[in-house]
Amino acid sequence: MARTALLTVGRFPAALTLARGLHEHGVRVVVADPMKRQLCSVSRAVAKTFQVAPPNTDIAGWERDILDIIERENVTDLIPTSEEVCHVANLAPRLTKTARYVGPSAEWITQWHDKLAFVNYAISRGVTAPSVYTTADGEARALIRQTECVLKPRRGCSGTEVSFIPPGSTLPPPSQDILLQRRVQGNHLYTLSWVDAGEVKATASYRGSTHSGTVAIGFQSAPTPFSVKQWIEQFVADTGVTGFLSFDFILDRSGIPWGIECNPRLSSGVHFIEEAWLGAAVMGEASGSPSISPAGKRAQWSYSTLTEAYKHLFRFQIPELIRCLRDLFVSRDAVWSWRDPLPFILMTPLCWEFIWRSIRERIPIGDASQCDIAWHWFKPGFQQEFRQETPEETAIMPRGNEREA
């Protein structure tokens, strides 16, 4: 039987890469997104696109829209591609037996997406993660007296509201939603893993080569150290999870990987996995070893890289400008394809909705692109108000206990 995959956001390059991989494997791909026009809407890999209600302001409408698309389009596979994974996981128990949800369950999302609960879980699995506390915890004051720290939202994404503070700094008002974490000095490494029934089938590692704020827009493939492979395998073992898992690591001077956060979803590492293998793997039909780009291969979002280059030029930041230009001229564009050119050609008008939101509301473009779908901007109580399921079926972010790594 022919399979139809529904991607629940299509505005990002990672979703486009996944759509192309699924299409190459013979899967019919449809996309739902609160944006009327987005990258996937003009792709040859996508059969249909649907504009749906934004889940952060109309969760009930969004759920109705997704369930309606699943029924009308005979969707066999429901696949989240970005921060909307939290909403999709909550919806998954309501799917019929003919539709498969591809991603972590709400139970796992609550433990992995929450940056405090993530550290608790990682330590319980015997892997390394730096100590973290809410600013309401007395231990946070002791920590900032001892060492440099990172201040960040408990459910943030895309580097939102992240700041580094020196020892002895004054903490912001106590909050259960703001975290203070020990800063680990070392080299950053990002990973994307495809996990099937709790078994890691492929991992692509990469580093950011060009950044817009704290968000990487240029990427360089990197080898995956054995210690990182072990860390990921130990983290997901016995979970039974099938889906994409992304991790941010810092490797200290001893080579020890410290897990900073988990994004239980697709990420830019997908640009370093062969599309044909990727599409087959997501459908549970892959054979042979995954094809991962060799270390040193580069990819970029060239429009974003060019924007950063202009910014550095106007600010006379010559070293940063040179780095941007190097990426611009030597890196493969993650969106461009001779067989599917329109997403690249039309990228600026297709992204105009959140570009304009960024200008109008004076917020970073990363925030503007996520604020209608990501849990960082979602009020959990709002979902309880509209959902008809029992409380046990609704994922609630836990208030975990702080633990030292």
Please tell me what each predicted stretch does:
Residues 1-103, 398:
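ATP-binding N-terminal substructure of ATP-dependent carboxylate-amine bond-forming enzymes
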Residues 27-30, 129-130, 149, 178:
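Hydrophobic anchor at the start of a short beta-strand
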Residues 47, 95-166:
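A conserved helix-loop-beta module that forms one wall/lid of the active-site cleft
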Residues 159, 210-214, 219, 263-277:
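Glycine-rich phosphate/pyrophosphate-binding beta-alpha loops
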Residues 162-231, 250-259:
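Phosphate-binding site of ATP-dependent enzymes
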Residues 281-405:
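Peripheral (often C-terminal) accessory segments that flank ATP-dependent C-N-forming ligase machineries
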